[in-house]
């Protein structure tokens, strides 16, 4: 009898210890792919500090515009300021976004490929004309590069050998699988993500033609978890900022 009484007294405590606590609300984020390494690190740090999981979906800026216009809803958007301004005008995002950082463009080749001269704008022009294939994306950085080719007066010559992809990952895969004189252009952060697979960052575009794409994090107006979304945006612009800098997003 005494044993039964002891068990009865202990059992509620054991059940309380084994019962999991309340699940923390998860937030969803739609972001441009160029900030992926920094945002992944910040999301992990935020979850560790607060217990709130962060589920991130990466798309190009044109895809983000399309999804937001179609009514897709996330808790937070991370996109270039011009896109965020459009979303704000349409009432899709809240006020109080924070600057995440900016990403510059770089030149990428596969292992063993001849290293091109990228020392100045004229060298880039020669490199592009000499390449058998010129690879870049259809996102913000790719649109800039296309305009750069037009300003250089060589777009008509480059277009037949240009390979354009929706994502940076596809650009890197094309370069890695190449067998000739392929040269790729894309955000430096995306190039570095494929370093372990063999991509070689030749270097950034020269200063006179470099282009930086900035990114802003902002809560969506129709987000389901507004308080957590706002906390995450504050974290990204504060404690999480060094994680972006460490990933090459300055």
Where are these regions (language model features)?
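Bacterial N-terminal signal peptides
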Residues: 5-16
């Amino acid at each position: 009898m005494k044993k039964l009484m002891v068990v009865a007294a202990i059992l509620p405590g054991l059940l309380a210890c084994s019962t999991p606590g309340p699940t923390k609300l998860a937030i969803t984020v739609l972001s441009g792919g160029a900030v992926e390494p920094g945002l992944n690190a910040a999301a992990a740090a935020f979850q560790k500090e607060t217990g709130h999981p962060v589920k991130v979906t990466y798309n190009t800026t044109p895809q983000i515009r399309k999804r937001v216009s179609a009514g897709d809803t996330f808790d937070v958007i991370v996109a270039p300021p011009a896109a965020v301004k459009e979303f704000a005008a349409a009432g899709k995002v809240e006020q109080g976004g924070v600057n995440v950082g900016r990403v510059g463009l770089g030149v990428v080749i596969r292992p063993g490929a001849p290293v091109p001269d990228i020392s100045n704008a004229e060298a880039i022009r020669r490199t592009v004309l000499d390449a058998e294939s010129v690879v870049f994306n259809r996102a913000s950085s790719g649109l800039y590069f296309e305009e750069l080719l037009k300003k250089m007066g060589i777009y008509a010559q480059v277009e037949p050998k240009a390979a354009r992809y929706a994502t940076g990952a596809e650009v890197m895969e094309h370069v890695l699988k190449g067998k000739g004189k392929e040269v790729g252009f894309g955000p430096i952060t995306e190039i570095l993500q494929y370093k372990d697979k063999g991509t070689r960052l030749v270097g950034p575009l020269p200063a006179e033609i470099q282009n930086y794409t900035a990114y802003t994090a902002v809560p969506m107006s129709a987000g389901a978890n507004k308080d957590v979304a706002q906390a995450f945006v504050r974290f990204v612009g504060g404690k999480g900022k060094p994680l972006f800098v460490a990933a090459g997003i300055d």
